[in-house]
Amino acid sequence: MSKTTVIQIGNTDDKLSQAMWARFFERVDSAIKSNATQIFFSGASYPTAEWQNAAWVFEIDEDASLRLYDEIKYLRQRFNQDSIAWTEGKTILINQK
């Protein structure tokens, strides 16, 4: 069974230099792309915004979700982040039926 997941990262405390933020973003992006069955959205804050943030919305299978969760935990520690937001839930399609 798959579920919809949202991951959000940020650098609002300026712990990461621009180069490190770019590496962190790339590693999270790569981890999601290699585990998600479908990515619905990915985006980041405007380049001139005061704070750097990024978010992904995607569908993922249960087994892959467990692997990704462990990888995201590792990346949080590796890049000295206090937290990474992970939200998951069931998607309900509203249609004419």
Where are these regions (language model features)?
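Conserved short beta-strand edge segments in small beta-sheet-based binding/regulatory domains
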Residues: 37, 77-96
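Short, conserved charged micro-motifs
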Residues: 15-19, 62-70
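Secreted/extracellular ectodomain signature
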Residues: 22, 41, 95-97
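Extended, folded cores of ATP/NTP-driven motor/assembly subunits in large transport
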Residues: 8, 17, 54-57, 83-85, ...
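Short S/T/G/P-rich N-terminal loop/turn motif that feeds into the first structured element of a domain
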Residues: 1-24
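Short, flexible N-terminal segments of the mature chain
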Residues: 18-38
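Short, intrinsically disordered low-complexity segments
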Residues: 33-66
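Short amphipathic alpha-helices in soluble, non-transmembrane regions
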Residues: 24-27, 66-79
